[in-house]
Regions:
Chain A
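Glycine-rich phosphate-binding loops of nucleotide-dependent enzymes
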Residues: 1-240
Length: 240, 315
């Protein structure tokens, strides 16, 4: 079964069609990368999928249910998790409490919550800073904290909006390992600029350009496709 | 972490013990004042729940205070119910008014929320004046001493009154502390800190906010009903805009989003006016200057400033 099916999605901002008739189907346990140049409509598209933005037209099914009109908090409660492109955490609260807020919604009591939080923090290697204020974390660690918040909800679909943006090289390598761990039991939709990451983790890549799907295929297909390279990497980068 | 919990227990337990012990040493005048302060601090705590912990600035809390005051007053004086039942009716009235106003006002945010709550409170004030035959309008009405018996205790007796005020304050204070440590309270704080994130973690933010308004209104109404019973008077001035501004000032002065802030704020303001009015007829000028100074030098309020500088563990 497909976790997510989007058909004919359109989002109109006054005169601009940020998302123009996008159709997308993500099967279970797939890592799907969404790439495209700046302004291609990637964040708008995941905004529609997660419910932060309303569709002007089209239909979205999540786990076989029509969620086109479902408000965002209910979509999350159904099993979506979303991490923001611009880090969005609870800065004045501890790292533990940040994840606990995410986990508590699904836990019966505080003891369960603590166990879930400990597990999520371990998976992103942040267990050692559990009692630090989130504001005091490095930027890279804050990104990981966001992912831990998503993981603690055991989502069916994890949407990551540019998770490696601003990470150091070593942190990116850690992140790739983490995705390989997450993919064991979670479907992932990943917006990513870093092509190395995409090549290493994605099963299928969807390329957006001017709000439309330009191409869809395996990472190898994408690399071979001249049209994509022109749009995404710019003409100068095209290799034979 | 554990040591912080101990410090908290010590401080808050100490404050409650001190409040309890004060009655034995205070002269009659201040004895009555502190009883009044504890009831008003309950009102301020109700306000702080919404303003300090959910970041919703209401300019219409007088309508909740008055709902408790009149709910109790009308039930006791006109319908002849007992004081304990009247108190419950008052709290219930506040909760219901809170639910209605909350459901409507929460459709707005920020400045619009302030204006909408202010307008609702004015509407409440005018309703009280309109039904003057029952409410006695501006004049208000006195609650007879026979109606102020609480399980045999005469609430017009200063010592029983002090105990009653202390009990209501304690229950409210401990409830607020418990609430803050509950999952519900922690979610409220999460909403205050980053509402967008709370939504995207799957929380129905509107539901949480509405519940917070209802709790806040019920607590304000508890204070209103208690005030009426303890001091024996129900009047429209308690529904006026002044009584919506007071809790905001108290909480700002004491420290929004701190458990002790409301009590500290009411104490401070009460005695600031009390003392300065004894010295000069221009006491409002003194109060004004002090308020301006505090906002300039301790923008987070007294307890907020103490938390920022010394006691990071304060809830």
């Amino acid at each position: 079964m497909s976790v997510l099916v989007a058909k004919g999605l359109i989002r109109q901002f006054n005169g601009l069609r940020a998302v123009d008739n996008v159709t997308l189907e993500i099967p279970e346990q797939q890592v799907r990368a969404l790439i495209g140049p700046n302004g291609a409509g990637k964040t708008t598209l995941v905004g529609l999928l997660s419910g932060r933005l309303a569709c002007s037209n089209g239909r979205i099914d999540f786990l076989g249910r029509d969620i086109t009109k479902v408000p965002p908090h209910k979509r999350i409660a159904m099993g979506m998790a979303y991490t923001f492109q611009i880090t969005s955490i609870f800065p004045s609260l501890s790292v533990h409490e940040n994840v606990a807020i995410a986990a508590r919604r699904l836990c019966r009591n505080e003891k369960d919550t603590r166990a879930v939080v400990a597990d999520a923090l371990k998976r992103v290697s942040l267990a050692h800073v559990a009692n630090t204020d989130a504001a005091d974390l490095s930027y890279g660690h804050q990104r990981l904290l966001e992912i831990a918040m998503g993981l603690s909800q055991s989502p069916r679909l994890l949407i990551l909006d540019e998770p490696t943006q601003g990470l150091a090289e070593g942190e990116v390598a850690e992140f790739i390992k983490l995705i390989h761990d997450i993919r064991q039991n979670t479907t992932v939709l990943l917006i990513e600029h870093n092509m190395d990451v995409v090549m290493q983790v994605a099963d299928v890549v969807t390329v957006l350009n001017h709000g439309q799907v330009l191409f869809e295929g395996t990472p190898a297909d994408v690399q071979a496709n001249i049209e994509v390279q022109t749009a995404y990497l710019g003409g100068a980068h095209v290799k034979a | 972490m554990r040591r912080d919990v101990q410090k908290n227990l010590l401080l808050h337990g100490g404050v409650l013990v001190a409040l309890f012990a004060l009655q034995f040493v205070l002269p009659a005048y201040h004895h009555g004042n502190v009883a009044r302060i504890m009831v008003l601090a309950t009102y301020a705590m109700g306000y702080n729940l919404l303003f300090g912990y959910v970041d919703l600035l209401s300019l219409g809390h007088a309508v909740f205070f008055a709902a408790g005051l009149y709910g109790m007053g009308i039930a006791v004086s006109h319908l002849g119910v007992s004081a304990p039942l009247g108190l419950m009716i008052g709290v219930l009235a506040g909760g219901v008014v809170g639910a209605i106003i909350g459901a409507l006002a929460l459709r707005t945010e920020g400045v619009a929320f302030m204006i909408v709550t202010l307008m609702f409170a004015q509407a409440g004030y005018l309703i009280i004046l309109y039904f003057g035959e029952i409410t006695r309008g501006d004049e208000g009405f006195v609650i007879q001493q026979v109606d102020r018996l609480f399980f045999g205790g005469d609430l017009s007796d200063p010592f029983i009154r002090y105990y009653a005020a202390f009990t209501v304050f304690c229950i409210s204070f401990l409830s607020i502390l418990a609430l803050l440590h509950s999952p519900f309270g922690k979610t409220l704080i999460a909403i205050r800190e980053n509402q967008e994130r709370a939504v995207m973690l799957g929380y129905n933010v509107m539901r949480f906010k509405l519940l917070a308004v209802i709790f806040s209104a019920a607590l304000s109404a508890l204070a209103g009903a208690t005030y009426g019973l303890l001091f024996g008077y129900v009047g429209a001035s308690f529904a006026s805009v002044q009584y919506s501004i007071f809790p905001l000032l108290w909480v700002l002065l004491g420290g929004a989003g701190t458990a002790l802030g409301p009590l500290v704020g009411v104490f401070f303001m009460f005695y600031l006016i009390d003392i300065s009015s004894g010295m000069t007829t221009a006491y409002m000028l003194v109060a004004g200057v002090v308020l301006v100074g505090l906002t300039l030098f301790a923008p987070q309020g007294l307890m907020g400033e103490i938390r920022r500088r010394f006691w990071r563990w304060l809830p």
